[in-house]
Amino acid sequence: MERPQKMPKVAKVKNKAPAEVQITAEQLLREAKERDLEILPPPPKQKISDPAELADYQQRKRKTFEDNLRKNRMVVSHWIKYAQWEEQQQEIQRARSIWERALDNEHRNVTLWLKYAEMEMKNKQVNHARNLWDRAVTIMPRVNQFWYKYTYMEEMLENVAGARQVFERWMEWQPEEQAWQTYVNFELRYKEIDRAREIYERFVYVHPDVKNWIKFARFEESHGFIHGSRRVFERAVEFFGDDYIEERLFIAFARFEEGQKEHDRARIIYKYALDHLPKDRTQELFKAYTKHEKKYGDRAGIEDVIVSKRKYQYEQEVAANPTNYDAWFDYLRLIEAEGDRDQIRETYERAISNVPPANEKNFWRRYIYLWINYALYEELEAEDAERTRQIYKTCLELIPHKQFTFSKLWLLYAQFEIRCKELQRARKALGLAIGMCPRDKLFRGYIDLEIQLREFERCRMLYEKFLEFGPENCVTWMKFAELENLLGDTDRARAIFELAVQQPRLDMPELLWKAYIDFEVALGETELARQLYERLLERTQHVKVWMSFAKFEMGLSHGDSGPDAELNVQLARRIYERANEMLRQLGDKESRVLLLEAWRDFERDASDSQEMQKVMDKMPRRIKKRQKIVSDNGVEEGWEEVFDYIFPEDEMARPNLKLLAAAKMWKTQKDNTVDDPPATAIASEPEPAADAAPADTTDSGD
């Protein structure tokens, strides 16, 4: 077995106190700097004094270079240093040989070709340099630096034809845009405008970019060829078509025309661009168009620009949120103002295609008005009745009538058919609407239509159908009775009112009873009206009913000699007395106060001071008292101050309570013995008052 290897023990530090002298980082750096080795002196310069020493020196250097190349032939810097050293020694042939060996070793190294050609040009070896550039561009035609150097050399040698020939060879490879621009600039330096134009003709098809077409057009303009520049812009618009065109081209085209004072042409270009470009790519175009119109346009032109800009904004809004119906309404109003029928219809079709995402009426309210406006436009502006009818039918088929409907739409459709003299279609549509979704508005609209047509039998049938669906609707009963009254059939109207008031459930019974009473009063049936008031009071004791009853009695006429004021006052006063007594029994203090105030005003108008004083004696006084606040859970939450009314009649009706309090006090005094001190009796005297106070408070709260 191998013995376990023993690890050296960690030396224990006996003294862990900090050293007295602390070493800083600055001190460490200073000591390291002081201990640096001294800089070696440069080697001595060697002076060569005769050809033998020179030959020996050259042999040693060449041997060093060759050794380096044998060690690593792939290091380009060794070749370059070797060739440049030979060039310094004026050994051009040797240097050329080294460059050739380097190219044989790595012929695709751009630096080698450039250095080699630079050496030939520096030593004025033009043919060698030309041959070298030919070889370079043949091997690597995509290296633009070779072509730039080659053409520059030929141009410096004033060999313009040779430089042009090199450019042509270069252009056959369809280089980048800068190369074409360099060729154009070369021709322009020698005033060869036609040649430059030919280069541009080829350039814009090799690199079909908008900016290159704009450069071509500006080239023509800068040399005075205005028609040529315009023709270039027109060709560019045709070349790109509607799919690939950009707003930059139209802006440049319009500014060109603006510079030539052709403002109408510029305006047409802007409008054409706005019509054919997608709306999300015309922001700068709008700005340029607006500036142009502000500088050169009239009021109509400026308004046209503003309208176009607003159309673009609305297009963005509806594209971002297709269910933004408010934006659709604004957009459609703008389109309708222009009057382009096809565009209006197309926009309406786009708008109505955005159906609300959920079958909830709140989402559909604004959407339905798109259909309504569409139908009204087709009827009133386009005057296309068949298309209008189809719009209404399509919309009605789209609405989920089992969940909700729109009565307004049914009625508009029926009214449209009436205007088209299609009465049967209108009735059929409304009948279908009532059968599918009986709504109050539908019934009333249908009834109003039949009343206008003087079809009263149909009105009766519709009212009967209406009341079958909603017998609790008081307005329907009132309208039905009003119709019969207008037709002179009072018995039928009275029977309708009787049926109405006998319904077990009504939404607004007070209006129905009032209408019934007004109906009888208008017929002069005073006794029947009084009976109706009595019947109504059997059902409710509301203070307003009593007040209305009193006013009714006050306004009656008795006999043929005119109104009997005294009799009316007595009848009305009797009603007030009955009402006061009834409300007192019910304990309705608030209503009782209202009644007494109305009674007081009545007596003031009657100018009867005696009766007026009686009423004033009945007026209550208002007091403030505290009562407990009890929550819905029955928990007491504190006290609050409330106002209450104390009526004199109620206080007079409390003798029994006062008698009970006095009897209790007498009993207390009797229970006290004769031996008790008087102070005890005196102390017990307030007890009945304390007992009576709660009784009074309780009574006042009843």
From Swiss-Prot:
Entry keyword annotation includes DNA damage: no
Main location (coarse class): nucleus
Motif (Nuclear localization signal): 620-628
SMART domains on file: HAT
GO cellular component, one term: U2-type catalytic step 2 spliceosome
UniProt entry keywords in alphabetical sequence: Developmental protein, Differentiation, mRNA processing, mRNA splicing, Neurogenesis, Nucleus, Repeat
Compositional bias of kind Low complexity: 683-702
Region annotation (Disordered) ranges: 670-702
Gene Ontology MF term list: RNA binding
HAT repeats: 56-88, 90-122, 124-156, 158-189, 191-222, 224-259, 261-295, 305-337, 339-373, 383-419, 454-486, 488-522, 524-555
Result of knocking out the encoding gene: Causes defects in the proliferation of brain neuroblasts and results in the absence of identified neuronal lineages in the central and peripheral nervous systems. During embryonic Malpighian morphogenesis, most of the cells of the Malpighian tubules fail to undergo rearrangement to form tubes with a two cell circumference. Only cells at the distal end of the tubule rearrange.
Subcellular location: Nucleus speckle
Family annotation (Gene3D superfamilies): Tetratricopeptide repeat domain (1.25.40.10)
Expression across tissues: Transcribed in all cells during embryonic development.
Example of a GO biological process term: oenocyte development
Purpose: May be involved in pre-mRNA splicing process. Involved in embryonic neurogenesis and cell rearrangement during Malpighian tubule morphogenesis.
Family statement: Belongs to the crooked-neck family.
Listed name of the protein: Protein crooked neck
